[in-house]
């Protein structure tokens, strides 16, 4: 039976050996070049392939059409993947009549994704395993063919668990590969309700946060012990690594991070204390805890910290362009609530941020991004994080002023992106749910959903494609020039200060503001094309909390990611939104100041938005990236958001001339 193999690491080597022992004919092996920054303690797939006389390749992009064609010419009967690090395109998987199978180091459906070996230890699991499953378009989601369980001992560390997994994988493959060859396998679908997914880990993820419990920190040490990079902390500006540790449940009470004793080296935690059994100062040698304490100059009462002291002293400088806008002013409020941010802002007005103007860590300049280019370039260079939030984002403007939308949303933002590349600054860019366009997926997925827009003669799409092209430019700068970036896609955020009723009067506002204006003025609520279009409405507080976590970027998990920020549970049609808003309006204590409700009126989109408009029937986000990268879930119910948004706008109305 002919096979093509994708393999890396020890698991790749043992998988190849198992295939050969089972009588498979391996036509080619695809692997990776070794990362010079990674400690190579594992077997070489390339060397094994060469010794066995099997053609071996390590392309940068195995999914490139040229490689897909070359694999097709090999005519594999079956495909196997053993710890290959890149997602293999469905076009390749479909080349094998018997299908494609992947070996994964966890008990699927739990711990899908990357580094399951390390994650199970981080999370203190007592059991894991290996799974052979059929490969499908979604990573690690195919039917299970075989599975072996492994107990995790309390003294297991990453390398001992790795050896256990390798031993189990050999057993599993020895039992299962002949059955696959004979076409005699039983497949069990994975239970999606039990699925969990984890992202890649980097050395920076393993800092010890002393406010956590000693048990949690001990698990971190176990998860990344040698030959992995190790858990670390700081004494002042000096970094040190903890290679092994021990939990002390009953220890004297002390401030987390304080040295309780130096022999043994015992550090107070949020709960209990952690004994550093062995460790290493900087680039030195490994030594026992008491010697490490002496080397680091620690005494009883000394304090450790999770980051260098110099980093802790300086506030992170955040540049927000469009700081007076809906997202900008709420984000400013969230950042200033903490004591480690300095916010620099630019906008053409200041009504929404007037409450911050006297704050010592808020610096505002009134100006236009198309004019104040020198100020912007200087502050991009000066700041650590850049959020270019300036955009025309109201649908009526897409058809009314398409060229202005392009000039502001694309051209001006491209200049800012290039400044970030020039000065090597981190950019957090507001993409949009609009980029998905008329995608037919049930859930819009950042990494897999197609971005589908209408024809050129529908100018309504100029906003969507401007944003999409900027997304692609940023991604390319990240790949080719090392730009540190995160793209976030808001899904219908709403709340107080969304826009204003004056904007609604000229049709240049979001849907809920327009509906509130209709109620305030006693005019009919217009339902465009019947108002059956569905959206997932997200409370601004939920959205801002997610955006704040992107800025925090714990363990650099947000770098290079695209993250939907929306609430898939708050799905409603525009008609349903209007009905919920009306019910809230009728119960409001200021209701008697306003005219009677004038009813709903169905209007055609062309008469409201003008020629060249197309609508989208549904827009529901997948939030798996937000869960994985941010540990975030939306919490606020749509009705609460509607009530608070309505109350805010009603209290902005001048009631002096209204009858009481």
Curated annotation (Swiss-Prot):
InterPro entries: Arna-like_SDR_e, Bifun_polymyxin_resist_ArnA, Epimerase_deHydtase, Formyl_trans_C, Formyl_transf_N, Formyl_transf_N_sf, Formyl_transferase-like_C_sf, Lipid_A_modif_metabolic_enz
Catalyzed reactions: UDP-alpha-D-glucuronate + NAD(+) = UDP-beta-L-threo-pentopyranos-4-ulose + CO2 + NADH; UDP-4-amino-4-deoxy-beta-L-arabinose + (6R)-10-formyltetrahydrofolate = UDP-4-deoxy-4-formamido-beta-L-arabinose + (6S)-5,6,7,8-tetrahydrofolate + H(+)
EC number: 2.1.2.13, 1.1.1.305
GO MF, one annotated term: carboxy-lyase activity
Binding sites annotated in the UniProt record for UDP-alpha-D-glucuronate: 393, 398, 432-433, 460, 492, 526-535, 613
Keyword Nuclease attributed: no
GO biological process: lipid A biosynthetic process; lipopolysaccharide biosynthetic process; response to antibiotic
Cellular component terms (Gene Ontology): membrane
Pathway assigned to this chain's UniProt record: Nucleotide-sugar biosynthesis; UDP-4-deoxy-4-formamido-beta-L-arabinose biosynthesis; UDP-4-deoxy-4-formamido-beta-L-arabinose from UDP-alpha-D-glucuronate: step 1/3; Nucleotide-sugar biosynthesis; UDP-4-deoxy-4-formamido-beta-L-arabinose biosynthesis; UDP-4-deoxy-4-formamido-beta-L-arabinose from UDP-alpha-D-glucuronate: step 3/3; Bacterial outer membrane biogenesis; lipopolysaccharide biosynthesis
Coiled-coil region list: none
Region (Formyltransferase ArnAFT) residue spans: 1-304
Active-site residues (renumbered): 104, 434, 619
Pfam families the UniProt entry points to: Epimerase, Formyl_trans_C, Formyl_trans_N
Region listing for Dehydrogenase ArnADH, in residue ranges: 314-660
Gene3D superfamilies linked: 3.40.50.12230, NAD(P)-binding Rossmann-like Domain
Transition state stabilizer, annotated site positions: 102
Cited HAMAP family: ArnA
Purpose of the protein: Bifunctional enzyme that catalyzes the oxidative decarboxylation of UDP-glucuronic acid (UDP-GlcUA) to UDP-4-keto-arabinose (UDP-Ara4O) and the addition of a formyl group to UDP-4-amino-4-deoxy-L-arabinose (UDP-L-Ara4N) to form UDP-L-4-formamido-arabinose (UDP-L-Ara4FN). The modified arabinose is attached to lipid A and is required for resistance to polymyxin and cationic antimicrobial peptides.
Annotated PANTHER family: BIFUNCTIONAL POLYMYXIN RESISTANCE PROTEIN ARNA, UDP-D-APIOSE_UDP-D-XYLOSE SYNTHASE 2
Family membership noted in the UniProt record: In the N-terminal section; belongs to the Fmt family. UDP-L-Ara4N formyltransferase subfamily.
Protein name per Swiss-Prot or TrEMBL: Bifunctional polymyxin resistance protein ArnA
Annotated organism of origin: Escherichia coli (strain SMS-3-5 / SECEC)
Lineage per the UniProt record: Bacteria, Pseudomonadati, Pseudomonadota, Gammaproteobacteria, Enterobacterales
Encoding gene (name): arnA
């Amino acid at each position: 039976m002919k096979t093509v193999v994708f393999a890396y690491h020890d698991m790749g080597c043992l998988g190849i050996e198992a295939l050969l022992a089972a009588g498979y004919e391996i036509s080619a092996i695809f692997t990776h070049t070794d990362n010079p920054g990674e400690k190579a303690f594992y077997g070489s797939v390339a060397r094994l392939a060469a010794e066995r006389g099997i053609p071996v390749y390590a392309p940068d992009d195995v999914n490139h059409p040229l490689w897909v064609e070359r694999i097709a010419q090999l005519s594999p009967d079956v495909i196997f993947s053993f710890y290959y690090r890149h997602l293999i395109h469905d076009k390749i998987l479909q080349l094998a009549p018997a299908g494609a199978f992947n070996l994964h180091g966890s008990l699927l459906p739990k711990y899908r994704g990357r580094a399951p070996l390390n994650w199970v230890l981080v999370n203190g699991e007592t059991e894991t395993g290996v799974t052979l499953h059929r490969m499908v378009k979604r990573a690690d989601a195919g039917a299970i063919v075989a599975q072996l369980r492994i107990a995790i001992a309390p003294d297991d560390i990453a390398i001992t668990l790795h050896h256990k997994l390798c031993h189990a994988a050999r057993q599993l493959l020895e039992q299962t590969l002949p059955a696959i060859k004979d076409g005699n396998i039983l497949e069990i679908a994975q239970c999606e309700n039990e699925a969990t997914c984890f992202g890649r880990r980097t050395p920076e993820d393993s800092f010890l946060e002393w406010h956590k419990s000693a048990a949690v920190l001990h698990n971190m040490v176990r998860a990344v012990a040698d030959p992995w990079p190790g858990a670390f902390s700081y004494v002042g500006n000096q970094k040190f690594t903890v290679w092994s540790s021990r939990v002390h449940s009953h220890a004297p009470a002390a401030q987390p991070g304080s040295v309780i004793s130096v022999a043994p080296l015992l550090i107070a935690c949020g709960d209990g204390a952690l004994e550093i059994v062995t460790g290493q100062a900087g680039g030195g040698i490994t030594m026992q805890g008491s010697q490490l304490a002496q080397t680091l100059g620690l005494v009883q009462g000394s304090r450790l910290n999770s980051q260098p002291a110099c980093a802790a002293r300086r506030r992170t400088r955040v540049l927000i362009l469009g700081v007076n806008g809906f997202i900008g002013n709420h984000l400013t409020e969230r950042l200033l609530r903490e004591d480690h941010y300095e916010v620099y802002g630019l906008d053409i007005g200041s009504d929404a941020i007037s409450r911050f103007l006297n704050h010592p860590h808020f610096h505002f300049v009134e100006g236009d991004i198309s004019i104040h280019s020198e100020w912007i370039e200087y502050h991009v260079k000066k700041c650590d994080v850049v959020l270019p939030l300036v955009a025309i984002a109201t649908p009526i403007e897409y058809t009314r002023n398409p060229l202005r939308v392009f000039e502001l949303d694309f051209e001006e933002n491209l200049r800012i992106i290039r400044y970030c590349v020039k000065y090597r600054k981190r950019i957090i860019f507001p993409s949009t749910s609009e980029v998905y366009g008329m995608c037919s997926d049930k859930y819009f997925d950042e990494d897999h959903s197609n971005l589908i827009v209408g024809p050129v003669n529908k100018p309504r799409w100029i906003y969507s494609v401007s944003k999409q092209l900027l997304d692609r430019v940023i991604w390319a700068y990240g790949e080719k020039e090392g730009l540190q970036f995160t793209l976030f896609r808001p899904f219908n955020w709403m709340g107080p200060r969304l826009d204003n009723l004056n904007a609604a009067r000229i049709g240049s506002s979001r849907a809920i503001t327009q509906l509130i204006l209709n109620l305030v003025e006693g005019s009919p609520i217009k339902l465009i094309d019947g108002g059956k279009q569905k959206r997932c409405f997200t409370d601004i507080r939920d959205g801002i909390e997610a955006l704040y976590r992107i800025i925090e970027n714990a363990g650099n998990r947000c770098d290079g990611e695209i993250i939907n920020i929306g609430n898939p549970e708050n799905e409603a049609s525009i008609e349903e939104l209007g009905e919920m808003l009306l019910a809230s309006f009728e119960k409001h204590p200021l209701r008697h100041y306003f005219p009677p409700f004038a009813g709903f009126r169905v209007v055609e989109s062309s008469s409201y938005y003008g020629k060249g408009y197309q609508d989208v029937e549904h827009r529901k986000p997948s939030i798996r990236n937000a869960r994985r990268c941010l540990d975030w879930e939306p919490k606020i119910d749509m009705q609460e958001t509607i009530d608070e948004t309505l109350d805010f706008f009603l209290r902005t109305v001048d009631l002096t001339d209204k009858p009481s």
